[in-house]
């Protein structure tokens, strides 16, 4: 929803007529139904740009991620139903499902049905391992049924920058005194620990780093069997920088920093330890709740844009 809202803000001239046409063609639809029709149309349009890569790479690259309704974060059945609908929109769709307790269930079901997932709203090692295990169960079910999995490319996003953000909020809220800059390593520490476990266990699911805040979120992950979704402005900065491009994925986060985060911030401890959270605790983790609230708010802003098309404000001249 956030990305769709950003696209509309920049390219409304490209979508205004399409929105009006959707509304006119479906006179009984609610603003939510119109909003999702628009989201799907945007996703299909964007996916076409990647089809050549998708075909060349036999489905392992060239996918377009489309996010399930953030309001469904507690409902595995609705996440699964919507995810499978999205998978049918184009051959190269990647289905974004939150790493909530219900989302973990949906990830297994969507994977078992043959769709590639992108787990989102994920910040902790425990969440990332639950995602990888769910994907493994789904793939095993397909294998047992004799169904092909060779073109599937599931990923689990750890939102490294948003975990850093949450550490900053906790430090300020709880008046925790630590060295300046330590919180900027929190996401990397969790990511690198999860990566080590992924490599050890040989998971088919791959880790993806998202939510960039500084160059370490790129430079410290160079050389890994990972996916980096680097926004264009950050790409330009990194390309023009003098940061040496060398393999660092196996370089541990400085021990003194990890020790400080671990000893001072309880929310870091549960994010860093593989058994730090149970699945039942995923939804209540601070970064999870904070991000879900933001995604839902962005969705409501998108719906408000659609509302202005359907019910223009009579208090102002158009």
Question: Can you name each region flagged by the protein language model?
Answer:
Residues 47-54, 58, 87-90, 135, ...:
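Structural signal for hydrophobic packing residues in well-ordered secondary-structure cores
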Residues 36, 40, 121, 180, ...:
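Hydrophobic alpha-helical scaffolding
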Residues 16-25, 169-182, 273:
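A solvent-exposed, charged loop/short amphipathic helix patch at secondary-structure junctions
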Residues 3, 42, 46, 78-82, ...:
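General structural feature for long, well-ordered alpha-helical segments within catalytic domains
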Residues 116-248:
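Catalytic alpha/beta core domains of metabolic enzymes, predominantly
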Residues 247-318:
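C-terminal extensions of enzymes
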Residues 1, 97-99, 119-123:
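Glycine-rich, histidine-containing beta strand-loop boundary motifs that form or position
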Residues 3-5, 10-107, 112:
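Active-site beta->alpha loop and helix N-cap motifs at the rims of alpha/beta catalytic domains
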């Amino acid at each position: 929803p956030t990305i769709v809202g950003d696209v509309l803000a920049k390219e409304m001239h490209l979508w205004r007529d399409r929105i009006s046409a959707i509304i006119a063609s479906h006179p009984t639809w609610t603003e939510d139904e119109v909003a999702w029709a628009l989201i799907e149309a945007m996703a299909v349009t964007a996916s076409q740009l990647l089809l050549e890569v998708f075909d060349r790479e036999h489905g392992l690259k060239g996918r377009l991620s489309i996010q399930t309704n953030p309001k469904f974060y507690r409902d595995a059945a609705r996440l699964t139903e919507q995810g499978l609908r999205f998978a049918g929109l184009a051959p190269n769709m990647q289905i974004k499902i939150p790493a909530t307790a219900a989302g973990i269930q949906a990830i297994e079901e969507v994977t078992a049905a043959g769709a590639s997932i992108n787990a989102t709203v994920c910040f902790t090692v425990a969440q990332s391992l639950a995602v990888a295990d769910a994907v493994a169960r789904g793939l095993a079910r397909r294998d047992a049924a004799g169904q092909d999995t060779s073109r599937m490319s599931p990923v689990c996003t750890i939102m490294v920058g948003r975990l850093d953000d949450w550490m900053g909020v906790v430090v300020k809220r709880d008046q925790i005194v630590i060295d300046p800059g330590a919180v900027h390593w929190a996401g990397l520490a969790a990511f690198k620990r999860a990566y080590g476990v992924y490599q050890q266990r040989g998971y088919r699911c791959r880790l993806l780093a998202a939510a960039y805040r500084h160059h370490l979120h790129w430079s410290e992950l160079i050389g890994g069997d990972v996916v980096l979704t680097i926004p264009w402005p950050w790409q330009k900065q990194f390309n023009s920088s003098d940061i040496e491009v060398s393999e660092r994925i196996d370089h541990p986060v400085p021990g003194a920093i990890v020790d400080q985060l671990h000893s001072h911030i309880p929310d870091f401890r549960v994010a860093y330890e593989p058994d730090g959270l149970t699945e039942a605790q995923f939804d209540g983790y601070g970064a999870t709740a904070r991000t879900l609230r933001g995604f839902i708010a962005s969705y409501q802003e998108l719906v408000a844009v659609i509302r202005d098309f359907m019910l223009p404000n009579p208090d102002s001249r158009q």
